Amino acid sequence: MKESNLHSRMKRYETSSKAFLMRRTPAIIRVDGKAFHTFTKDMEAPFDERFRNAMQQTMLKMCQNIQGCVFGYTQSDEISLVLTDYETITTDAWYDYNVQKMTSIAASMATLYFAEALRAEVDAYAIRLTAEQPAPPSQFATERSNHQSSRIQGNNEYISCMRAKMFAALFDARAFSVPKEEVCNCMIWRQQDATRNSIQSVGQYYFSQSQLNRKSLSQIQEMLWTEARVNWNDIRTEWKRGACCYRDNTDSSKAHFPWIIDKAPPVFTQNRNYIERWI
């Protein structure tokens, strides 16, 4: 068998499964933590500062290192990135919008960057404890003394647990094309999911599953206020509706606009231009 014939035949098998996104159309990559319900089991509830910071830093690094990325959004254990390839007529798409390469590399990047970021967060937290300068407790840390977060907050058990699992996090990824008109709607969809996750997380912190059974989001908010005296609207914005990443182009004198993390994004349905200006 001639080597050239073997090579050609094998390449045909490989090529037949390739898929490409549509050029000159926005692309969205979303990475999700694999089995993060288990991964986050021993973290501070209802929200873990170090986990949240690590996710935001992962988003930042991905925005900085993925060609054509113009906007990032993260909530819970997921990151959504918006890519464009039409800034100029000669602008190239990231890996020619090869879906296999986009998803495999994006998942690998998220896994690596998250491990690095979480390690940095845990190490910094341990140093503060050693120096007897613990980070300020979250607004939930002392609400219920019998809750898991009260037991592990500021405790070496928490640090040991985090260090044991920091390199166990894995991410999957998907990539798809969307019309320009739908990019904002896609981010609205994810932000609405963030709001739902946030309300449910706080509800689960204070109430049992049976108490929350069949309760709507508005009913959970009412329970939080009437029974726990907690106003969900007073929670920090990044815990209610996620965080975003984009270039700071306010100073036109700069040669390169730096990427920044916005921890207090607006409600997207009320300010569509917040996203659409980048598309």
Task: Please annotate each region the language model reported.
Residues 1-279:
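Regulatory and interdomain segments flanking nucleotide-handling catalytic cores
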